[in-house]
Amino acid sequence: MMNQNVQGQGNVIKETTNKVFIVGALVKNGLEVINEGEENEAIRGSLTLRTEDGSEHDVQYYANRYKKSNGSFTNELNPQFDTLLAAKEDFIDMSNEYGEPATVIKIGGGSFRANDYMSKNTGALVSTFRINASFANKLEGKDLELNPQLAKYEVSGIITKIEPEMKNIRI
């Protein structure tokens, strides 16, 4: 993402670069097909990839079956849905029962995203980051040799304002 302004709690951050590149062996395939209302089928979930250094990276995906236009679904199929459906059905993870080697995957369109939510246990705001991506491509043959299994993150931005955190203040 280029030059996106992100605002939150008094801070303004100008995001200038947000790119994630990962090539790794599939540890866990957590993609699932779901029905969202009567109109839409979607695929969501994650692929967990392990790079050569042993680190694991959880990559989140979501795609509707049909494209949207002006907030409504069209009859046009979303190619991202088909790509992820093929990944769900065809990619082999490390826990497969046949002992086959895990599929090596290269993610496409990856980026960091804020993941903020209220904790059900404490009621406190939890702020984390997660990796979202658009595509997952299976690497085979010569592509395996040309793409080392590693994770590369390119994230930069400009913080224009920081305010002190105020917690549990009673007025």
Regions found by a protein language model. Name each.
Residues 1-171:
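OB-fold and OB-like single-stranded nucleic-acid-recognition modules
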